[in-house]
Amino acid sequence: MIHKNWAELIKPTQLVVKPGADPARVATVIAEPLERGFGLTLGNALRRVLLSSLQGAAITSVQIDNVLHEFSSVAGVREDVTDIVLNLKGVSIKMDVEGPKRLSISAKGPGVVTAGDISESNGIEILNKDHVICHLDEGADVFMELTVNTGKGYVAADKNRPEDAPIGLIPIDAIYSPVKKVSYEVTPTREGQVLDYDKLTMRVETDGGLTPEDAVAYAARILQDQLSIFVNFEEPESATRHDVEDGLEFNPLLLKKVDELELSVRSANCLKNDNIVYIGDLIQKTEAEMLRTPNFGRKSLNEIKEVLSGMGLHLGMDVEDWPPENIEDLAKRFEDQF
C-alpha cells in the first residue's frame, strides 16, 4: 500500500552530536539507522545545502584613505592593498540586523591591525578578533571604511560594486556561508537483527556564528521546505476516530489481542516478551522500535506488516489517549466485532 510507504521506512531514532575541540565551531553529527542508500542521499543533499544556502555575513567592500585602487600600497603598511583585501575576506562576522552596514578601522603604528580593531555596532559581532589584517610600521596610520552585508553562498567582487560607487571603493569577493567545511561518511550499521542499514556521519565546521548542530538543522529545514511542493496528497487518517456512535474514539480492532493474530511462534513470543498485548500497542511501534526487540528480525517484521495491512493498519500509527483506562472491559464489549 504505497500511501503508507514513508511511514514504514526505518528512520533514525535520535541525532547524536559529538562536540569537537571548539564545540561552537566543530562537531560530528551522526544519524542512524537509515534505509540502505539513504545515507548517501541525505549526506550529499545536506552537504550541498550547508555550503551553499545558509545565510551569513561578510565584508563586501572597503575604502582606504589615500588609496584609489587595489593595486596601490599604503605608506608605512607592510602589506599592499591586494593582501589587505585578501585578509579582509577572512574576517568572520555574525550579523543579526538587515544590511548593508558601515564599519571602520582606525589604527596607528607600530603594531598589528586585527579584526578586533573593527568598530562594532548593534547586531554585528566580529567572531575571529585575532585574525590579522595588516602590520603598521612606526609612525604609520591607517583608516578604512568597510561595508558588511548578509547573503548566502559566494558572490564575486564585481557583483558587490554599486552603480554609484565612489572613487576608491574596492569591492571584495563575499563568502557568506557560515559553514567552512563539511564532510560525510556512510558506513553499515545494524538495527536489531538486521545488518544492512546506513549510518551517516557528518563532520561540520562553522565560523562560530552558527553551531554545527544548528547549521544541520537549518539545512534540513531548507530541504524540507523545497520538497514540500512535490507532496500532492493529504496525510492518511490516524487510527483515531472522531465521528462515531459507539462512543469509541478509535478503531475497535485495536482492542484485539495480538495472540489472536495468526502469527508464527517466534513472532508471537517476541511480542509477548516486549509486553505488546493489544493491536493498539503494536501499531504505535515503529519499525526501528520493533527491530530492537530481542530475537526479532526482518522476517518477523514483514509478517506483522502483512497481517496489519490486511486489517487496514500499519506500524507507526498515532492513537490518541491510548491505552484507555478500562481497556479490558472495552475488549470484552467489542470482541464480537473482531
UniProtKB/Swiss-Prot annotation:
CDD domains: RNAP_alpha_NTD. The keyword Cell membrane does not apply. It comes from Cereibacter sphaeroides (strain ATCC 17025 / ATH 2.4.3) (Rhodobacter sphaeroides). GO terms for molecular function: DNA binding; DNA-directed RNA polymerase activity; protein dimerization activity. Signal peptide: none annotated. Residues 250-338 are annotated as: Alpha C-terminal domain (alpha-CTD). This is DNA-directed RNA polymerase subunit alpha. Belongs to the RNA polymerase alpha chain family. The N-terminal domain is essential for RNAP assembly and basal transcription, whereas the C-terminal domain is involved in interaction with transcriptional regulators and with upstream promoter elements. The lineage of its organism: Bacteria, Pseudomonadati, Pseudomonadota, Alphaproteobacteria, Rhodobacterales. The gene is rpoA. One of its GO terms (biological process) is DNA-templated transcription. It comes from the Bacteria. DNA-dependent RNA polymerase catalyzes the transcription of DNA into RNA using the four ribonucleoside triphosphates as substrates.
